[in-house]
């Protein structure tokens, strides 16, 4: 009992409350009906699985729970203090608190998770993606405690998780590998010498790495030491192991991976390949299956090589064998991820399978559900990862509330895998992914068209997202042609990050109309509440007897103020003059569900857009795209709210100061590293914006800095003094 009291228990048994919240998720319709019953699976050792603990959070925890419920298996969630009100907690049958927000004290605490499994009487643990999913010690601990680990045996995690070991095993199994150094000597000098031997550019990679963490490209010996130290710090934080390997970096390769499954009976199959070449910060952003332009004979060779890799380590469960492929479709083994991948839904869409169900059945001792001959490839699928990040600021992750969230309608060919709802917070403590948008169609072009259509219907207000960037990417001619590689985003950076275009005058008219109609709706509500229809505050129509009323309105498009003269016509329409052009505007607001729509006609051209007005910004979402128009703050208010930046760099986001390189009195050059922040599982180096002398450092190592707060102050230079005078 004492052990059980170490974790606080939240029994999520309120069926009414849980199902009240689920419809807003827009999850794909299911053919099963959940009833209060359980299903038993018997493992090879005779153990039953009636309850599974998901040792993860967010969308992957919700994904696993849906399949478990389909099979009648009860689900147990774990959560940190930051996730107390999260979606995966609400979906679970039981949920247990396991500590503070930092992952090291919660989701990476093996002892706490094992204790929850015992307390809840869960027979199995599904690790999801990330966290402990590829941790050999955790898999071994589950085995010692008699708990079924839904994943490969600890030996396979060890052999494939240590990249130096995996390369040797793959070479022995006849799988081609990339030239590199995978030795035990981890001294900086040894690694530098091997980098010189291999020849620049090289890739520094964490031995236990994954997800782009602890990975750096080094193009010259001069930058080797700084990049090595940065990779070590990030690897230590993410995997508690800073051992590194060095590999030859192949310019503009393709990243092609193969989904494999093994079982306890010695069987192994492949479920075709996925192309994950388009990446930023060495992390995938859009994936597709099958890989474009791959001929059937190459596809077969890839699959067979992946199966050889799995069999070489007696693999059990879901795994992904990753390859580097050149322009001639020659491929080399890169690594094997011993878990279910984030992008697994695209494989499910083209094969008609449920890979989480396969995981559960195989963990229970069953054979792989289909033979290799029975696994067929149908159609084409894309997955777009929707992140809370700012593409224009080097894809810097952001945190904050999802003030408004609406998604495309889910159907059998459109899936939305998410772990958040409207009103939820994207936390600074975890990965900033909001959702995965997955679409399927009969061929690649049709799937791509569906992807872009669905992205336009994915509307988020409250923080920066990469949705517009994904639209630009998926519409790029080279992407449409299937000419993808890992340097795609850097190569086409200018085209993908187009400068913000000035809004069309017709769009400004729409925004002005939306604001006017919202004001009128608020006035009408006031009238109803005040019960005084003769109050002078009860009308916003602008109508006057015998005269026309004209209102001067100012909106802000980007950095430009736009003057709009709005004349209220007697028939309820509006004449809007912008510069020397006049537009006849008519429209109304209506609601669908929780959303407000603006139906509008500008000079006879009808349109429909979702309208959101939040604080001082008007948001319009339509099939043509989205626009944001600001309502300028009066000068007497803006002067009160303005802040001084104190001449130094600001924190790009909320995070922890990991390393401080400077102190008061130090002279620095523009571009010098000042400090390192850790935020949202990524390391960010703060560089000096100018030459100068450090006057004050506001944070020490280990301190928490809030977004947009000054980090370093510089001494005022003589030129600055003269300008201020």
Curated annotation (Swiss-Prot):
Q: Where is the active site?
A: 339
Q: Quote the InterPro entries the UniProt record gives.
A: ATP-grasp, BC-like_N, Biotin_BS, Biotin_carboxylase_complex, Biotin_carboxylation_dom, Biotin_COase_C, Biotin_lipoyl, CbamoylP_synth_lsu-like_ATP-bd
Subcellular location per UniProt equals: Mitochondrion matrix
Which residues are in the Biotinyl-binding domain?
643-715
- Know the name of this protein? Methylcrotonoyl-CoA carboxylase subunit alpha, mitochondrial
UniProt organism field: Homo sapiens (Human)
A Gene Ontology molecular function term of the record:
methylcrotonoyl-CoA carboxylase activity
Q: Which GO terms describe its biological process?
A: biotin metabolic process; branched-chain amino acid catabolic process; L-leucine catabolic process
> What illness does the record link it to?
3-methylcrotonoyl-CoA carboxylase 1 deficiency: An autosomal recessive disorder of leucine catabolism. The phenotype is variable, ranging from neonatal onset with severe neurological involvement to asymptomatic adults. There is a characteristic organic aciduria with massive excretion of 3-hydroxyisovaleric acid and 3-methylcrotonylglycine, usually in combination with a severe secondary carnitine deficiency.
Q: What does this protein do?
A: Biotin-attachment subunit of the 3-methylcrotonyl-CoA carboxylase, an enzyme that catalyzes the conversion of 3-methylcrotonyl-CoA to 3-methylglutaconyl-CoA, a critical step for leucine and isovaleric acid catabolism.
Gene (UniProt): MCCC1
Name the pathway it acts in: Amino-acid degradation; L-leucine degradation; (S)-3-hydroxy-3-methylglutaryl-CoA from 3-isovaleryl-CoA: step 2/3
Question: Which keywords belong to this entry?
Answer: Acetylation, ATP-binding, Biotin, Disease variant, Ligase, Mitochondrion, Nucleotide-binding, Transit peptide
According to its UniProt record, this protein's enzyme class is ligase
